[in-house]
Regions:
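Sec-dependent bacterial lipoprotein signal peptides
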Residues: 1-21
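Domain-level marker for long, solvent-exposed, non-transmembrane regions
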Residues: 21-188
Length: 188
């Protein structure tokens, strides 16, 4: 064999080898249609039930700590909105079923006390789920769920209502608690 014969043969074998190396890769086709999204800290276990108020939220930032603070703040806001709307319903139902002299004034007092209690209790909300992810661009996403005990909330609310002289004479804790628990049971 001469150099003239070996050179074309070597090029042919080299080309075949290179072409064979590329054939082992499989190309994953793009998924068509709907794609299921996994939401951390947002399952059924992280929703309000008859015993607890719960809220979940996310926070995103290039700073890890800021993302975590944002998710906590967003959770607290969502939890406060949920509790406040429930307390307004409970107050309306309780006041309307009771015999208060001035319904509007009593309702306003109950709602003001509810907001005060909720704001004080939010700091005691317990984190029941927390996940932290980092995106390809380096930013962080914090997923969080928090909860607040319904029993603790109604107990603190009762404590505050019992201190209000305008309401104390006509206030019935057991009836209020029953109204509260009935509304909380609807959460599930």
């Amino acid at each position: 064999m001469t150099l003239r014969n070996i050179l074309p043969l070597a090029l042919l074998l080299g080309g075949a080898t290179l072409a064979g190396c590329n054939g082992g890769k499989s190309i994953t086709p793009k998924q068509a249609g709907e794609i299921e999204i996994l939401e951390y800290c947002a399952s059924e276990d992280h929703k309000s039930d008859k015993d607890h108020f719960r809220a979940s939220a996310t926070g995103e930032s290039i700073s890890r700590e800021t993302a975590k603070k944002m998710s906590r703040s967003n959770c607290e806001s969502a939890l406060a909105r949920s509790i406040n709307s429930t307390m307004e319903i409970v107050t309306d139902n309780y006041v309307n079923s009771s015999k208060f002299n001035n319904v509007e004034e009593v309702t306003e007092t109950f709602n003001d006390l509810a907001r005060t209690v909720v704001n004080q209790q939010l700091s005691g909300a317990i984190t029941v789920c927390e996940r932290l992810t980092q995106k390809a661009d380096g930013s962080y996403v914090s997923y969080r769920a928090i909860e607040l005990s319904g029993a603790e909330l109604v107990s603190k609310y009762n404590e505050r209502l019992s201190q209000d002289e305008r309401i104390r004479a006509e206030y019935n804790y057991e009836k209020f608690k029953e109204t509260f628990e009935a509304e909380l049971a609807k959460q599930r």
